[in-house]
Design a protein with these regions (language model features):
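Bacterial signal peptide processing site
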Residues: 23-26
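Extracytoplasmic ligand-binding site segments that recognize negatively charged/polar headgroups
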Residues: 59-72, 88-95, 111-273
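Extracytoplasmic/periplasmic substrate-binding proteins
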Residues: 220-223, 262-329
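N-terminal export leaders
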Residues: 6-10
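Mature extracytoplasmic/periplasmic domains
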Residues: 317-318, 322-392
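C-terminal motif of bacterial Sec signal peptides marking the signal peptidase cleavage site
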Residues: 18-21
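Short, polar/charged alpha-helical segment
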Residues: 42-50, 54-57, 62-84, 175
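Conserved C-terminal helix/tail region of periplasmic/extracytoplasmic solute-binding proteins
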Residues: 38, 277, 385-424
Length: 424
């Protein structure tokens, strides 16, 4: 994999330093200082955070995202705030959730997990058990840039985020094709058309096996469920009887699709990097991306061909916002709040959508709320660099639907294993 270009990251990180100014307070290890429980006194938060090392637990399955986090946020946190960023890569967010629960069960105070990249069922699990710090997210200085009235932001898989989660970025399920070998005119625009396409091109399509750590595969299957049942809105709240009514049609659709898949559906990619490799090696014709900016970051990183482009079905393209949350027993909650606020800084939001920087997910802030001319310039410049690999934002918006309620996640994943893999 080729290295990620760092010039743009460095410029935007420097802009964040210049815009916000620097502090000269001396650092310590933060071990004897009590962290504030909220962000209402930001000067107090900054003072408590200086000298702390924040343990940020996040999914580590993307090398480009890992590098973006280290190279973009790490230097700013160190140079401006005196905070050491310790990125803790995990295979699945549930690993961090289980650690927080284990710390609670063991009676541990000052837990090792300071910040988690989280959403969906993992958020609901910690929220329901009272294991998340509350009352801080909407008091962050940059929280004013977030449209909290938008249900896509204020509700995480149908669950009210309150002030327990702060948004980081947005994502939307899209397919990626190579325009050098597939024409736009022949692309399927629905799950029904996809089935026809796959069986007309046997072995040229597959999808990620749904399951923990493979949310992209789960999302693909849920999109099929939405189409078969007549839409996404009815799945926003949990209804077991509706699942019982429509899940047989879902398994029938996927079972009929199976013999047309790569390797006759006898095996499935386990994660997106494996799917990308099959696509890059011309074994299949479609991969996927969650990035609102399309496959630009994958192209820049040499993961997929330079002629790759994103496309979506006409509807049922599931999208959401992803967040960071602080466990209630976090030892370095102040530093975690500073990280969360930095993620919402317009210069950082601009950096994350530029394909060459390797992250490529969409905004968590409402750009119209940014009034500072220099910050607006950074956002405008970033938007102008998306390139033609990205889907037109208007098309993305028209295809967008929200995700299903949390309980459906396990039903889809468990049901898929039982129905498609015989319970393996």
């Amino acid at each position: 994999m080729s290295p990620i270009p760092r010039r743009t990251v460095a410029k935007l990180a420097l802009a964040a330093l210049v815009i916000a100014g620097c502090s000269s307070t001396s650092a310590d290890d933060g071990s004897t200082r009590t962290s504030p429980s909220d962000a209402s006194d930001w000067d107090e938060v900054l003072a408590a955070a200086r000298g702390q090392a924040v343990n940020w637990y996040l999914w580590g399955g993307s090398e480009s995202i890992n590098a973006f986090v280290d190279d973009t946020y790490g230097p700013v946190l160190r140079d401006r705030f005196g905070i050491t960023l310790n990125r803790v890569p995990i295979a699945d967010t549930v690993d961090a959730v289980n650690q927080v629960i284990a710390q609670r069960d063991a009676g541990t105070t000052g837990g090792a997990v300071d910040l988690i990249w989280i959403n969906g069922e993992n958020f609901a699990t910690l929220r329901d058990q009272g294991l998340l710090l509350d009352g801080w997210a909407r008091d962050l200085p940059n929280a004013d840039l977030v449209d909290w009235d938008n249900p896509a932001v204020s509700r995480d898989f149908g669950v009210d985020v309150g002030a327990m989660e702060s948004p980081w970025s947005s994502a939307q399920f899209q397919f990626v094709y190579d325009s050098a070998r597939t024409s736009e005119a022949e692309l399927p625009r629905s799950y029904a058309e996809l089935s026809d396409w796959a069986c007309a091109h046997p072995g040229r399509f597959t999808y990620i096996a749904p399951g923990p750590g493979a949310f992209q595969g789960t999302r693909f299957v849920k999109g099929a469920l939405f189409e078969l049942s007549g839409g996404a809105s009815q799945w926003a709240t949990f209804d077991q009887s509706m699942w019982d009514e429509w899940s047989p049609a879902l398994w029938a659709y996927l079972d009929a699709l199976r013999p047309c898949l790569w390797r006759n559906g006898d095996t499935y990619p386990k994660e997106e990097n494996e799917l990308h490799r099959l696509f890059a090696n011309d074994e299949i014709d479609f991969t996927i991306t969650q990035a609102a900016v399309g496959p630009g970051a994958l192209i820049a990183d040499g993961v997929v061909p330079p002629t790759s482009k994103a496309f979506v079905f006409d509807t049922n393209s599931i999208g959401d916002v992803n967040y960071v949350a602080i466990p209630a027993d976090a030892r370095h909650a102040a530093a975690a709040m500073v990280v969360a606020n930095l993620l919402l800084d317009p210069s950082m939001q601009a950096a994350q959508i530029i394909p060459a920087n390797g992250f490529g997910l969409g905004y968590a802030i409402d750009p119209s709320r940014v009034t500072d001319p220099e910050q607006r310039g950074l956002l405008d410049d970033a938007a102008g660099r998306l390139g033609d690999a990205a889907v037109d934002p208007a098309v993305l918006s028209s295809a967008l639907v929200g995700d299903a309620a949390v309980p459906y996640q396990d039903l889809v994943e468990t049901g898929w294993r039982d129905q498609l893999l015989g319970g393996l």
